[in-house]
Amino acid sequence: MVDASTKVVHMIDRDVVQWTRGPSERSGTPLLVTMHGVGSNERDLLGLAPALPSSWTLASLRAPMPWGQGFSWYPLGTPGSPALEPVDESVSGVLDWIDSVAADHPRIGLLGFSQGGSMALQLLRARPSGFAFAVSLSGFVVPGVTDGRDTAIEQVRPRVFLGHGDLDPVIPAEATARTQAWAAAHTAVTDRTYEGLPHAVSAAELADVAAFIGD
């Protein structure tokens, strides 16, 4: 365990968060927090908004670490199996940001793609009762958690949507299988595999996500 007094927290840049509603229109709406994949940025997942329930306000975050032309939530490491500590450092930063806006929103959901999908699941591990759901698209669950978080999440069994393509060349099959097994054991999971889909999001997948989120 990392001593709390020395723990690094990667803070979210509040000034670059992308919103689908203006400041005067957000209060009272459910909030969907979205997290992009490695090498992308806060604008990437805004394109999903028209396909998702319009009652939700979408807030798209920028990962805190520069990575090429974009940003990363944590060092890449072994695909699908990153080191745990840097992930938790970014999770702490996202939780701090969520706490700063939570009072305006009756429900908060999480959605991430690829590395952002791993963040969504790790945030749910941190606060099993704190979110309406987590959606992980072409993502994975981070291995190595041994501190009781999975016992806590199993007791709550929050809602999770897993979407992945059967032709994904980025996320190893072992990581996908590990994620499916973890979600089945610890959450109320909706698990979908999309035939012919690479490391991407399809229209059919988005329709399933929209139905899962609901109004």
Description of each model-found segment:
Residues 143, 166-172, 199-200:
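Acidic catalytic loop of the alpha/beta-hydrolase fold
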Residues 45-48, 149, 172-182:
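Short alpha-helix in the alpha/beta-hydrolase fold that links the catalytic acid
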Residues 8-107:
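Serine-hydrolase catalytic machinery in alpha/beta-hydrolase-like enzymes
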Residues 129-142:
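A conserved short beta-strand
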Residues 111-116, 120:
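Gly/Ala-rich beta-loop-alpha elbow adjacent to hydrolase catalytic centers
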Residues 174-215:
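C-terminal catalytic histidine-bearing segment of alpha/beta-hydrolase fold enzymes
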Residues 156, 161-164, 168:
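Short beta-strand/loop motif that positions the catalytic acidic residue
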